[in-house]
Amino acid sequence: MLQQKFPAAAKSFFAIDNFTKNLKQDFILSASNEEEALQLYKQALFFSSNENIYYFPSYNTIPYDHTSPNANILSRRAETLIKLTTNNSNSNKLLITHTANLLNKLPPKDFFSKYFLKLSPKMKFTTDELAMFLVENSFTRNASSIDVGEFAVRGEIIDIILSGPKAYRIHFSWGYIESIKEFDIDTQISTKSCRELIISPANEIVLNSETIGNFKNNYLRNFGVNHTDNALYEAVISGRKFTGYEQLLPLFYDSCSNLIDYLNDPIFIFDNLSKKAILEFEHSYNDFYSARSEANKLKFNSFYPTLSPTSLYFTASEITELLEQKNNILLTFENSEQASLIKNIAATSFIEKKTVFDKLFEVIKANSHKKIIIGSSVLSSFERIKSIIQNYEYKYNEINKLDEAKASIINVAIIPLNQSFYTKEYLFITASELLEEKPSSTNTNKKLKNILLELDNLAEGEFVVHKDHGIGQFLKLEALEIKGKPHDFLKILYAGNDKLYIPVESIEVIKKYGNDNAELDKLGSVSWQRSKAKLKKRIKEIALHLIQIAAKRKLNSSASVEFDLEEYDKFCANFPFSETEDQLIAINDIKEDLRNGMLMDRLICGDVGFGKTEVAMRAVFMVAKSLNEHLPQVAVVVPTTILCSQHFSRFIERFKGFGLNIKQLSSVISSKEAKIIRSELESGKINIIIGTHSLLHKNIKFFNLKLLIIDEEQHFGVGQKEFLKSLKSSSHVLAMSATPIPRTLQMSMTGLKELSIIATPPLNRLEVHTSVMPYDPVIIRDALLREHFRGGRSFYVVPRIKDIEDIAKQLKQIVPELSYKIAYGKMTPSKIDEVMSEFYAGKFDILVSTTIIESGIDIAEANTMIIHNADMLGLSQLYQLRGRIGRGKMRGYAYLTVASHKKMTSHSLRRLEIIQNSCALGSGFTIASRDMDLRGFGNLIGEEQSGQIKEVGTELYQEMLEEQIAIFKDESIVSEQPFIPTINLGLSVFIPDNYVADAALKLGLYRRIGNLSNEIEVETFKDEMIDRFGLLPIEFNNLLDIVKIKLLCFKLNIENLDSGDNGFVIKFYKNADMTDKILKFVTTYSNQAKIKPDNKLVYIKKLVDKNIIVEANQLLWNLSEV
């Protein structure tokens, strides 16, 4: 075995270098995970123009899964195997793959040589022959083909979608192929013609008489004759695919090959991580085999017989032994000098008071003997780098392949490099390192609103509110022609079947109503304006009250909190994990609050398990160890006994050795001990108290309460919150929640309460896989056993106490081999504590409980949750419950079950849709905001306001309240934008379907566009779109240009801007006094500018589409400058 040292970032470059120099030698480049494999492949395609570079993807399912892998992955794997088999050229081949794929048993190497089809125009072939070939090769026939592995027959035309996905349309005529063309899957319109088409099977399993015969014999040999009622068996022998049948692949063939067999005595290039992946995958498939075998002992899963691991996979020892017989290259990485390349540039530029790019160009000059490549993995960074190079007056060469690179010039390319490196001939610099910036100071609330606007988009049939016309119903997004050009409009229905069309660039006038029941307003009626005016007066009173509450707290000055920095650093060093960026930002926010001389009032909004408690502990340390306070005290208030016990244990462990007296007060504490604790709180002997509602009594007196921490504040009742208010008036306050109550979120969004967001997940955290489904004992058994056999435990949540015993009986039947215990709120606190302690210790498998576990449970080994009758729970409850699992490195699985016969309300359906679709890590804030939409803002200041909200809807109410608070803070702010400029330039204005196909996402983007308030935001949004979707089509670019023009028109009091072939017509807002400016403009541009009798301004200019935006901007600029 040859060992070579190389920079880690250059792994693919090294492989290509060897591949190019050894023209008769095949290579396998291995990766330690699937993400790395795909990145190495993309890099290799840049480094080499050789067509014999292949990528073999991994299944996106777990071993012994009952679902089939993604269709594109199945097709790509089969296509790669065929290319490896049928490539008859004398040139060598390079295969890039995740090392675990070497253990897969694959069809025999020679099998695929006869199962591919090469088609070309004028070839003799019929539609029937091709359709038969496709069915035998695992394609699915549908009315229209929209996914990989599908085909459609329409007379003499066959449409087929291959891996990629790439779609082809084959025309036949009189038994011959007339033409082969690519077509667009979304529009179904043909594009370019093809000279040749090679069709590979859509799956590694080909269903023909030979493979079906093998399956019958091998099935009989492995599982016996009892298969007459097995749906999988019946489907296969009938020549039909069955979901998950890929787990029986070896049964279809006489023998199997491994991936190495498909190449000619290859050299294996690997590193220690990719080598280790072989053993990890073997361990994984053995674990899943054990789980599946146990599940199959009862006949719940009889559709899926289980092959032994040695039948389905090669062993690690077999593959390792095979590799040892070959010439292998083990890469060891030397990173120190190379990895610091960009860091050194940044450091020296700071010392020499130069920009990073000044120093970079000096480095480039010093390396003029090398070919310089600056690579970016995203289009927006790529465009930005080109712009910077131009600003420095350098020339650049845009390249797609490394062999296009030139010396004595900067080469720029799209290439997914994650670190800069250099070789004798090349210097590779990554744009991501060059452009790396500190966290943006962009307003947090603004960013969050952008996310919410995009996620919480309008749905057809939903009630909306127009600022001027009242409540209507959104029908659809409709394209209308304006001056012969397509333009997207929102179509809104009003009473009397009246319709209102709103151009997408003015979408901000529409707000969601937020309720399923509403009475439509009549267009042109004065009743809406009257209702809105009355509400505005009431909102002014509410806003003033909220301002007074916040101002009163700010008037209560507080001494700056000072603490021993060396001792604090020691406390921080004891934290066993690396802080995430968001945690560090939140901690710094708290430091500033405690030192600014005013009482802190901050909300930490962070997803479950994202480290809010550690942030709170830092705050506790700062205050409890304050050097300028006499016996400062900290109270941590939590909603449940379970959470109280858990926090108490953690605080004791975390603060060990720092001389702080920590106690807990909850229902598990005896009355005698509680009396002592109350006395010590009053005397100042206790530094930190952690308690439930037991702390919220008038008989609790503190000696010197300086910090109040409210954990999961959404769980406290109105009376408890009133008592908390009395504590808060003279103490620093830190509230924490993943899904804050609407009132707290409302105050944070309006700037009355400071807000810190922890949205960065801890390292290696995986999102929880969430399924909403009818109650199914087969799936539940499978889920519980799978968790058990990977060494874990499960939660079974039952909303109602009366249903718990029935569920317990069902569990005895479904999983008799697993143990369970029950916990619910009416049990004695000591009994709940006993059950929870046993569950923590792993003494039983399933905890059957009510929702009492939604806060505070943190068990790394418990990663499966079944929620019974999930439709009975609120959105935030569902989210908090799901947050109990997947808190370690194992993926969590949540199954939200509903009764199959039950008809759910629209609100229940929507809750379940939201929780299923909000799987991404960090969705808590979104959930809280969606909860606002589902149930309104609730009780903002102690008086019921749902009636007021119902008048105008949740979004407009929120906007009106925010606006009024802003006015009280700054009297110069105009109370309401008096008009919305209308821009009509006769251009195509819409987001094309071939750019953003998803209609819901498109509406979300339109809503975000309506929220853009200045040119910088528009440009930032444009960069984001390029990064996500690619270069902007002209129609979308027109839309964003018009938004910028609209913003400028508002500043200039222009209500309408219209264009025609011969120039522009401007109408000014009626209340705007623009007389002097207009007269001055007409005088300055007397040859082109005229005033009409109706006071409209006419500007004469010959216009064409390609320059109309430029001319409009120039006109507005000239008008602003006079």
Curated annotation (Swiss-Prot):
EC number(s) from the headed UniProt entry: 3.6.4.-
Alphabetical list of PROSITE patterns matching this protein: HELICASE_ATP_BIND_1, HELICASE_CTER
SUPFAM superfamilies linked to this entry: CarD-like (SSF141259), P-loop containing nucleoside triphosphate hydrolases (SSF52540), TRCF domain-like (SSF143517)
Keywords carried by this UniProt record: ATP-binding, Cytoplasm, DNA damage, DNA repair, DNA-binding, Helicase, Hydrolase, Nucleotide-binding
All copies of domain Helicase ATP-binding, residue ranges: 593-758
UniProt short sequence motif DEEQ box, positions renumbered to this chain: 711-714
Domain of life: Bacteria
GO molecular function, one term: ATP binding
Gene3D superfamilies, sorted: 2.40.10.170, 3.40.50.11180, P-loop containing nucleotide triphosphate hydrolases, Penicillin-binding protein 1b domain, Transcription-repair-coupling factor, D7 domain
One of the Pfam families matching this protein, by short name: UvrB_inter
InterPro entries: CarD-like/TRCF_RID, CarD-like/TRCF_RID_sf, DEAD/DEAH_box_helicase_dom, Helicase_ATP-bd, Helicase_C-like, Mfd, P-loop_NTPase, RecG/Mfd
Keyword Hydrolase assigned: yes
EC class of the enzyme, as a word: hydrolase
Single GO biological process annotation from the record: regulation of DNA-templated transcription
Record localization: Cytoplasm
Entry GO CC: cytoplasm
Job description of the protein: Couples transcription and DNA repair by recognizing RNA polymerase (RNAP) stalled at DNA lesions. Mediates ATP-dependent release of RNAP and its truncated transcript from the DNA, and recruitment of nucleotide excision repair machinery to the damaged site.
Family designation: In the N-terminal section; belongs to the UvrB family.
Name of protein: Transcription-repair-coupling factor
Upper lineage: Bacteria, Pseudomonadati, Pseudomonadota, Alphaproteobacteria, Rickettsiales
